[in-house]
Amino acid sequence: MTDVTVKALAAERQVSVDRLVQQFADAGIRKSADDSVSAQEKQTLLAHLNREAGSGPDKLTLQRKTRSTLNIPGTGGKSKSVQIEVRKKRTFVKRDPQEAERLAAEEQAQREAEEQARREAEEQAKREAQQKAEREAAEQAKREAAEKAKREAAEKDKVSNQQTDDMTKTAQAEKARRENEAAELKRKAEEEARRKLEEEARRVAEEARRMAEENKWTATPEPVEDTSDYHVTTSQHARQAEDESDREVEGGRGRGRNAKAARPAKKGNKHAESKADREEARAAVRGGKGGKRKGSSLQQGFQKPVQAVNRDVVIGETITVGELANKMAVKGSQVIKAMMKLGAMATINQVIDQETAQLVAEEMGHKVILRRENELEEAVMSDRDTGAAAEPRAPVVTIMGHVDHGKTSLLDYIRSTKVASGEAGGITQHIGAYHVETDNGMITFLDTPGHAAFTSMRARGAQATDIVVLVVAADDGVMPQTIEAIQHAKAAGVPVVVAVNKIDKPEADPDRVKNELSQYGILPEEWGGESQFVHVSAKAGTGIDELLDAILLQAEVLELKAVRKGMASGAVIESFLDKGRGPVATVLVREGTLHKGDIVLCGFEYGRVRAMRNELGQEVLEAGPSIPVEILGLSGVPAAGDEVTVVRDEKKAREVALYRQGKFREVKLARQQKSKLENMFANMTEGEVHEVNIVLKADVQGSVEAISDSLLKLSTDEVKVKIIGSGVGGITETDATLAAASNAILVGFNVRADASARKVIESESLDLRYYSVIYNLIDEVKAAMSGMLSPELKQQIIGLAEVRDVFKSPKFGAIAGCMVTEGVVKRHNPIRVLRDNVVIYEGELESLRRFKDDVNEVRNGMECGIGVKNYNDVRAGDMIEVFEIIEIQRTIA
């Protein structure tokens, strides 16, 4: 055959040139349109195309559905029709011809090997039988020869000894008979052994033939999934209907093959089945109640443990006795017995500590693994950048003192701002944090309130500070909040610098201030103490530079240092909820550097720092030690005083925050339960108690705490203040709804209600009050509580009459003829009868007459007749005291 080009071959085969080139490429030949094609290459292409054309599906799956209706008789003679659908699936696999040939060859070889084994077994059995027959024939010949010799000897004895006794003959005959019986038994045993051997040989041959037939049927294609005994329902009637439908559809197909395949197995199973298998087969055929079959392959049983199992018991900080028993897989009574042996009595629901649980578990032979509840929290807090060198930092100075002693004004002059004039009432109502640059260095100031309601805020200020500047007015001296500030400073262990303010006033007396402070342990340096006293005037600016120098000198003595590099930590000075920015927290950084984007954990809250601002409202990207900043991005408003820590993983920060919330909730509930149990008897004995319900909203968290503490302290035995809800931010619709449901007063401190809340307030006619000064809020709540107090009853004597004589009246009984000696006697007023200045009766004046006329009152110096209600033992000389009850309205002190 001559070579042709690819293009000509494509025209001859009536295919495109590109397709032919692709087919050549698939066959492993690289060609272009103008290349020539040899005869060998054509043969290669043809073989490739034949292989592709001959490749078909190797597996064929057939699916069939059969539907039938089954009428099931029901109650009342009614029958119910049930639709039954039987789904069957058969898969046929196409065998490879080479694989089929290989399987046929293997099968032929196996059959030949089995036939050879069968022939060898038969020949072996024949040889053994022949050898056995020869042995038996030889033994038989020996026996016959012996018997013949015996008979000959017997005949000789009989001929020679004719005179032998008959008993000897009988004995010999008996002996011969026994020998014959023994020989017969031996022969039968040998025949039985030969028969068993032949049966064993036949059984081996039959088993080999059966296995060959099974292998023959296994080599043919069979369906992958056998659904012959599969039912879609458990009802006996439904299963019978399914089987009947299968028989109708299948017909006689496949029966002969299945019968042939099953016949040898059935024959072989007759000897191989055990008693348990036969019992299970009978149970499967017999079924149970309702026709349910039990699968023979589902064998299950419980074996009792023969030895104790030692477990690893994980124990938290607290655990109940029942939970401990579950962890050890024992009964609760056993744990209680073990505790009683150790000398501890407990119930199944009692909570025990970790140490007790460890002792009990180890006593019962288990291994204890102690787990701390705050393990994750400790791991998160300890995973920090450490090792950086500490550097000097600016001091944190807290301004403390009594209200109106000039703390904020003094700080104003230092910062050259006018913060005090902008505050409501001219008093500071939350902590202000500022840092100022001086000629000698930077100082961070914390301005705390001086009012008594802000004790907790002053305590937080003292804990976060390095130096306390105690401001005392020279004209006012030491006041209650001044003493409290001294106590906070001593409790925090920080040095105190005293600023004697208002020194420019004519009535200023600095020496008096020194004397009063010395009584509380604050001694000036000139008296041998450790406190610096500086005379200043916030109004005129006198002594400000000396105060700053004193602060920096004290800071230099303290040698304040902090790590500037690394993950930051600090404290929340103040927090509030801004309507546009969300939760805002004022944070004082103690060490490290706080960056924008850091993940912070703050008490119960967490979040990523989205923005940072300084006290001037300017955006900053980082804040070092002793720098106060406002941060945005927390999940909620944190509590003032909470520790702020930068962590690495936001997921772990969230887990720690949720754990803290849960723990706080548990402690709170436990405390409430304890107080309920302790006050149970008091609640049973006390009478009706009025409550003033308040929903409080304020601008910052510190104000919420201060106002709540002040209002709760106003509670008395008769009227109690109850804070139904409190929070930071404006008054919302939820707050108004809560107030309406609990009949509470809505109080807004430096916040206002939104539009939706105002609608609810108007529709429900709620009492809404706005305040900007805490004095006014407390005074009005006192007035509301005073209105709920029950009035005080006071007895006022209005008249006194002396009994001169007693006479009888058929209508009123004993009538006392009296002379009014003091005041006025009124009818129907309560009276007391006195005898020798001792009250002998207290009742009501029923009848009052003067000269037979009923009168309402009798004045001093007049005679009258008095009838006492339900009392007839009036004597001459008694005194009748007339009084009235006056209600006096009480107030909350």
From Swiss-Prot:
Q: Where is the tr-type G domain?
A: 392-561
Sorted alphabetically, the keyword list is:
Cytoplasm, GTP-binding, Initiation factor, Nucleotide-binding, Protein biosynthesis
**Cellular component terms per the entry's GO annotation:** cytosol
GO molecular function per UniProt? GTP binding; GTPase activity; guanosine tetraphosphate binding; translation initiation factor activity
- Return the InterPro entries for the record: DNA-bd_dom_put_sf (IPR009061), EF-G-like_DII (IPR053905), EFTu-like_2 (IPR004161), IF2_assoc_dom_bac (IPR013575), IF2_II (IPR044145), IF2_N (IPR006847), P-loop_NTPase (IPR027417), Small_GTP-bd (IPR005225)
Q: Please give the superkingdom of this protein's source.
A: Bacteria
Annotated region (G4) at 501-504
Region G1: what ranges? Answer: 401-408
Q: Where is the composition biased (Basic residues)?
A: 254-269
Q: Where is this region: G5?
A: 537-539
Region Disordered, annotated ranges: 49-303
Q: Does the keyword Cytoplasm apply?
A: yes
Task: Report the locations given in the UniProt record.
Answer: Cytoplasm
Region (G3) location: 447-450
Give the Polar residues compositional bias ranges. Answer: 68-82
Which residue ranges are recorded for the region named G2?
Answer: 426-430
Q: Where is the composition biased (Basic and acidic residues)?
A: 93-159, 166-216, 270-283
In terms of SUPFAM superfamilies, this protein maps to: Initiation factor IF2/eIF5b, domain 3 (SSF52156), P-loop containing nucleoside triphosphate hydrolases (SSF52540), Putative DNA-binding domain (SSF46955), Translation proteins (SSF50447)
Q: Where does GTP bind?
A: 401-408, 447-451, 501-504
What does the similarity note say? Belongs to the TRAFAC class translation factor GTPase superfamily. Classic translation factor GTPase family. IF-2 subfamily.
As for what it does, the entry says: One of the essential components for the initiation of protein synthesis. Protects formylmethionyl-tRNA from spontaneous hydrolysis and promotes its binding to the 30S ribosomal subunits. Also involved in the hydrolysis of GTP during the formation of the 70S ribosomal complex.
Q: Could you tell me what this protein is called?
A: Translation initiation factor IF-2
Q: Give the source species.
A: Salmonella arizonae (strain ATCC BAA-731 / CDC346-86 / RSK2980)
